[in-house]
């Protein structure tokens, strides 16, 4: 039986009639006639009404491709129950033992309608159903061809490859895809990993870049930004306060009507709008807003839909106070690069403190600006110590520049990183045949610098694990479904018009590899080259095929190497191109202190301590054995790491390779300048990290700490199996990770001490 429901027809475009034989004739624009055989029908009249047609002849008419159907008519996509039932009995293949399961339960296992948490097979079901429903809705909206049987077969294959962790959507996708966030609210920005915003045009709308960063960060999107707007505007200051006799209750409680009071709504939009009002009051010389925080939920209440628990209004009030304190000192002066970074960092601090997200930011500055280079020198800028940790700081390096001063700073605290914007604009992969200037509009990159981006652009990442495959043929099949997931995400527009203009034109994705160190160890570098070359070629062919089917542009770029972190832990893979710190090490992960995951871990004997950077998180230490024979990062020279990044930039990544090179400050520090002289022509970006084995006590609560076999055995001897089944009696709202799930995106600094914040 074919049913068409909720179809609204415009009286100026459509007329209908019904004859005695049950044939319904609908004239579309008085030209094209579509007929249905039916014994039951409800016809439209002169006004817009519902057309309800049942096809009792069951003739399988393909009606969904007609432009007539302005509302959804294709049945909602769902994987078959009998297919899912087979996986409900299979053990989830989490990597690294308890670590992979902790990360999953902490970050991606949503609470279901029956008030229990998802199991892995259910999370995968939600994600795959969500992916194919995005496709279905796009097809329906644009009158394209949809084959339900073909979709079911394709979705089942995607499901299997995610369940077995041959590829995984990013953490944002694992958490949000198929949830109310995308299905009913349509917040597709939550499926994207990263963004960039330039301050170059700050004069047109001074608060806009800051507001975009805050809104995106609260959706879990990591944001890069530049300082090109410095000196573009004067910080004017606020209008004088109203007369003392004017009482607050006498004022209108809506902004925009020459009034001061703003009741902050208990929503992401409300928090963002409050900051916009405050910034505009200084940039555009408007009234000083008076904020009423009474509508914001109390501390400890759950943040439904986006995960986590509320910390009350205090983080937002603190942000308001800090913005006022910062800008009051700058009235009458041009906005500086320091002002720009400070404002972005203060916003990031609020997002972290508010338990909404872990903010991930990267700042891009002028390599010739000593003011910018010194931002994380807290002897010079002690006032920044409480918030400067919120961004990685990098410079737009110029080809042929003198790297001496930059390298001096890198030796001090590992920053700044370097981004060669000329290379990012000019090349796809870094080979002469791909000097194509596809990204001539690019202005920066994302916080981990694996994606070239235009201003206000978002992009979606997806992660594949070559070492979890037995053959190239199997891996190429995985690439098909990994690509299809990422391409599907580009179908969803966002709430930001500026973003949609770029996103829908570029359709940029980043199909990544993790476990590269493992693959090289077991298969060799030459085989990796073969897989890269063949995989890259296939992705180009797949883009041709699926872009034609969906009637959208081909993706401007498709491949990258992201640093990974939590998602690679699920699959038991080393992160991105990076080698493990050691055969034996301690892995530290951050969990909200209110999380129900903490008691079972403490009961099992795992070490748990407060996180030093804020009062809302605790740090859990987990001993890891990465496997015999795998080379450790400490055994690989700086030059070899740079060579591997260059290899991947040449054979795989047309976006970028996220590469954090660890180095020996004593032996290799003097070579930094010379290394950059060579590799500036082979890379698009790179960052450096002083080797912890030679700089003891530099970092607090690092994500990784090298240990020896003796200490490893001592730790595990005191551990018991963790019983997570008790959590089913106490549902746990997960806390999704920041945009790219990486352990190297957010860097917390305290004087000379730096934290890679997971």
Swiss-Prot record:
InterPro entries cross-referenced by the UniProt entry: RdRp_reductase_class-2, RNR-II_ins_dom, RNR_alpha_hel, RTP_Rdtase_AdoCbl-dep
Source species, domain of life: Eukaryota
Transmembrane segment boundaries: none
EC number(s) recorded for this UniProt protein: 1.17.4.2
Annotated stretches, region: Disordered: 233-256
Biological processes annotated in GO: DNA replication; nucleoside triphosphate biosynthetic process
Database matches in SUPFAM superfamilies: PFL-like glycyl radical enzymes
Disulfide pairings: 194-459
Alphabetically ordered keywords of this record: Cobalamin, Cobalt, Disulfide bond, DNA replication, Oxidoreductase, Redox-active center
UniProt GO molecular function: cobalamin binding; nucleotide binding; ribonucleoside-diphosphate reductase activity, thioredoxin disulfide as acceptor; ribonucleoside-triphosphate reductase (thioredoxin) activity
Cofactor: adenosylcob(III)alamin
Catalytic activity line of the entry: a 2'-deoxyribonucleoside 5'-triphosphate + [thioredoxin]-disulfide + H2O = a ribonucleoside 5'-triphosphate + [thioredoxin]-dithiol
Positions of the catalytic residues: 448, 450
Residues of the signal peptide: none
EC class of the enzyme, as a word: oxidoreductase
One Pfam match: RNR_Alpha
Subunit structure: Monomer.
Family according to the record: Belongs to the class II ribonucleoside-triphosphate reductase family.
Protein's recorded name: Probable adenosylcobalamin-dependent ribonucleoside-triphosphate reductase
Source organism of this protein record: Dictyostelium discoideum
């Amino acid at each position: 039986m074919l049913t068409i429901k909720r179809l609204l027809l415009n009286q100026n475009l459509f007329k209908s009639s019904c004859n005695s034989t049950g044939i319904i004739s609908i004239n579309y624009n008085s030209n094209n006639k579509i007929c249905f055989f039916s014994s039951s029908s409800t016809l439209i009249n002169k006004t817009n009404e519902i057309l309800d047609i049942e096809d009792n002849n069951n003739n399988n008419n393909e009606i969904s491709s007609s432009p007539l159907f302005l509302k959804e008519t294709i049945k909602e996509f769902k994987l078959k129950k009998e297919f899912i039932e087979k996986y409900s009995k299979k053990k989830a293949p989490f990597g690294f033992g308890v670590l992979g399961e902790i990360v999953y339960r902490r970050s991606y296992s949503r609470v279901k309608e029956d008030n229990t948490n998802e199991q892995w097979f259910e999370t995968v079901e939600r994600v795959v159903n969500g992916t194919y429903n995005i496709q279905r809705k796009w097809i329906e909206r644009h009158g394209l061809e949809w084959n339900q049987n073909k979709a079911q077969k394709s979705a089942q294959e995607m499901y299997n490859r995610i369940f077995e962790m041959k590829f995984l959507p990013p953490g944002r996708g694992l958490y949000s895809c198929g949830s109310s966030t995308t299905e009913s609210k349509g917040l597709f920005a939550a499926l994207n990993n990263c963004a960039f915003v330039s301050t170059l045009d700050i004069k047109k709308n001074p608060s806009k870049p800051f507001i975009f960063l805050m809104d995106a960060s609260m959706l879990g999107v990591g944001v890069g930004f530049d300082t090109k707007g410095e000196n573009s505007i004067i910080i004017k200051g606020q209008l004088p306060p109203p007369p003392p006799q004017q009482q607050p209750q006498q004022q209108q409680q809506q902004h925009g009507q020459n009034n001061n009071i703003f009741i902050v709504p208990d929503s992401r939009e409300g928090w963002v709008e409050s900051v916009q009002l405050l910034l505009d009051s200084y940039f555009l010389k408007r009234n000083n807003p008076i904020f009423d925080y009474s509508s914001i939920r109390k501390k400890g209440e759950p943040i439904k839909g986006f995960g986590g628990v509320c910390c009350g209004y205090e983080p937002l009030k603190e942000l308001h106070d800090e913005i006022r304190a910062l800008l009051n000192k700058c009235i009458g002066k041009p906005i500086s690069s320091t002002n720009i970074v400070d404002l972005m960092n203060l916003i990031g601090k609020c997002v972290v403190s508010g338990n909404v997200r872990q903010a991930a930011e990267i700042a891009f500055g002028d390599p010739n600006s000593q003011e910018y280079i010194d931002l994380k020198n807290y002897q010079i800028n002690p006032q920044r110590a409480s918030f400067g940790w919120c961004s990685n700081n990098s410079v737009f390096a110029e080809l042929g520049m003198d790297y001496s001063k930059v390298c001096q700073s890198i030796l001090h605290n590992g920053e700044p990183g370097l981004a060669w914007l000329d290379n990012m604009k000019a090349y796809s992969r870094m080979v002469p045949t791909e000097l194509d200037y596809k990204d001539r509009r690019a202005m920066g990159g994302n916080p981990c610098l694996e994606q070239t981006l235009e201003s206000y652009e978002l992009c979606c990442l997806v992660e594949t694990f070559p070492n979890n495959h037995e053959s190239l043929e199997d891996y190429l099949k995985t690439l098909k479904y990994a690509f299809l997931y990422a391409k599907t995400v580009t179908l969803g527009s966002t709430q930001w018009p500026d973003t949609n203009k770029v996103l829908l034109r570029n359709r940029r994705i980043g199909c990544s590899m993790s476990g590269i160190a493992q693959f090289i160890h077991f298969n060799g570098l030459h085989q990796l080259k073969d897989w890269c070359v063949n995989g890259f070629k296939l992705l180009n062919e797949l883009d041709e095929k699926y872009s034609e089917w969906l009637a959208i542009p081909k993706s401007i770029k498709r491949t990258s190497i992201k640093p990974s972190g939590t998602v690679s832990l699920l699959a038991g893979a080393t992160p991105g191109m990076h080698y493990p710190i050691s055969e034996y090490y301690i892995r530290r992960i951050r969990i909200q202190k209110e999380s129900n995951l903490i008691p079972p871990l403490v009961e099992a004997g795992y070490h748990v301590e407060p996180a030093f950077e804020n009062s809302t998180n605790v740090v859990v230490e987990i001993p890891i054995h990465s496997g015999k024979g795998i080379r450790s990062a400490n055994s690989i020279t700086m030059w070899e790491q740079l060579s591997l990044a260059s290899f991947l930039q040449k054979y795989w990544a047309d976006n970028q390779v996220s590469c954090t090179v660890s180095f020996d400050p004593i032996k290799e520090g003097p070579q930094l300048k010379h290394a950059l002289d060579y590799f500036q022509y082979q890379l698009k970006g790179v960052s450096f990290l002083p080797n912890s084995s030679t700089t003891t006590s530099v970092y607090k609560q690092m994500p990784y700490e090298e240990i020896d076999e003796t200490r490893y055995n001592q730790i595990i001897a005191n551990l018991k199996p963790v019983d997570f089944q008790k959590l089913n009696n106490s549902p746990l709202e997960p806390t999704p990770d920041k945009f790219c799930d990486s352990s190297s995106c957010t860097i917390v600094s305290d004087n000379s001490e730096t934290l890679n914040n997971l």
